Amino acid sequence: MENALSSQNLGFMPYLVAGSQILGIANLAITGAWLAQLQRRFLWSGPLQFNVHPLCMVLGMVFLCGEALLVYRVFRHETKRSTKILHGVLHIMALVISLVGVIAVFQYHQANGYPDMYSLHSWCGIVTFTLYILQWIIGFSLFFIPGVAFTYRSQFKPLHEFFGRALFLSSIATSLLGLTEKMFSEYSSHPAEGILVNSLGVLLVVFGAVIAYILTREDWRRPPLPEEQALSMDFKTLTEGDSPTDQ
């Protein structure tokens, strides 16, 4: 992603973007190593089915969600349509992969007679995932489907941005709750695994902090291209019936 920033005078933003990519890959590598080696790999059935859940949630709700949030900061010369499509595709990938993780843990609980939805992790997780689905549906309806009034899009955009960031941070917090729940009774008997999981938790927090900082910098926001400004005003005139010169 950082190559798209090379021609921009954006201070140290390219280094933060590069750092976020390294952190994201490190999170996935540590999660995979933990589950594949110390938790004895992955299976879709039996006692190892649970291992599918944390990998899918870290990949989907944390890494891919974070990548989707960075699209409008990183790709500054590509058309708005291209960046919008990439943003939406990354979110739908995150949604599908996370859905696999949710199904895996429910099936694992059912097969082993464990109760569902009893822990704080599960409550936060299902609320975050449900809101993520609603966020995607509403965002798709307003920003991808042609003909939606300019006023509705402009009014909802701040809420869309806020909930996107809030759900990303909520996903990281829920992941930390899940890691603690998984390892709570095993720290004393598996110290090496405990260190690895704690390291993963710290890296998840740093990954979230770096992306959150990039998103808070308004001066790093993607500027509209000249042709996009003209199209935006034409679209507003078409859907609202007013003239740009009247504003």
UniProtKB/Swiss-Prot annotation:
EC number: 7.2.1.-
GO cellular component, one term: lysosomal membrane
Topological domain spans for side Cytoplasmic: 1-9, 73-84, 146-158, 216-247
Sites where the protein binds L-ascorbate: 80, 84, 153
Membrane topology value: Multi-pass membrane protein
Expression by tissue: Specific to neuroendocrine tissues.
Residue intervals of the Cytochrome b561 domain: 19-216
Location(s) in or outside the cell: Cytoplasmic vesicle, Secretory vesicle, Chromaffin granule membrane
Biological processes annotated in GO: ascorbate homeostasis
Catalytic activity: monodehydro-L-ascorbate radical(out) + L-ascorbate(in) = monodehydro-L-ascorbate radical(in) + L-ascorbate(out)
Vesicular topology ranges: 31-51, 106-124, 180-194
Cofactor binding remark: Binds 2 heme b groups non-covalently.
Chain positions recorded as heme b 2 binding sites: 73, 80, 87, 160, 221
Key words of the record: Cytoplasmic vesicle, Electron transport, Heme, Iron, Membrane, Metal-binding, Translocase, Transmembrane, Transmembrane helix, Transport
Function field: Transmembrane reductase that uses ascorbate as an electron donor in the cytoplasm and transfers electrons across membranes to reduce monodehydro-L-ascorbate radical in the lumen of secretory vesicles. It is therefore involved the regeneration and homeostasis within secretory vesicles of ascorbate which in turn provides reducing equivalents needed to support the activity of intravesicular enzymes.
Protein name in the entry: Transmembrane ascorbate-dependent reductase CYB561
